[in-house]
Amino acid sequence: MMPTLNDEQRKALFAELPGWSLQNDRDAIHKRFTFTDFNAAFGFMTRVALKAEQVNHHPEWFNVWNRVDITLSTHDANGLTHRDADLARFIEQAAQLTGAK
């Protein structure tokens, strides 16, 4: 099983990725992204989906019009791992490229 992130790694992750927060009910991180419209939100989700397939690590997400809520956790490890950190970094880049507010 993959090890979960330790306290130091978590602090570094949150410092690097502003706006992400730890969920209260489980060992997962969450962020809400807002875009100009549905097309921009869907374009963002498409970029993330392609990367998720490539690395075989998939987000939990919810989309309503221009808003996308994303939660990351590694189910096999029952918590946050480097896979979540890596995908969160990619998600941040994709959000910038697609005009997240």
UniProtKB/Swiss-Prot annotation:
Entry's EC annotation: 4.2.1.96
Any one biological process term the GO annotation gives: tetrahydrobiopterin biosynthetic process
CDD domains for this protein: PCD_DCoH_subfamily_b
Catalytic activity: (4aS,6R)-4a-hydroxy-L-erythro-5,6,7,8-tetrahydrobiopterin = (6R)-L-erythro-6,7-dihydrobiopterin + H2O
Domain of life: Bacteria
EC top class, as a word: lyase
Keywords, comma-separated and alphabetical: Lyase
Any one GO MF annotation of this record: 4-alpha-hydroxytetrahydrobiopterin dehydratase activity
Protein family: Belongs to the pterin-4-alpha-carbinolamine dehydratase family.
Name of the protein: Putative pterin-4-alpha-carbinolamine dehydratase
Organism listed in the record: Ralstonia nicotianae (strain ATCC BAA-1114 / GMI1000)
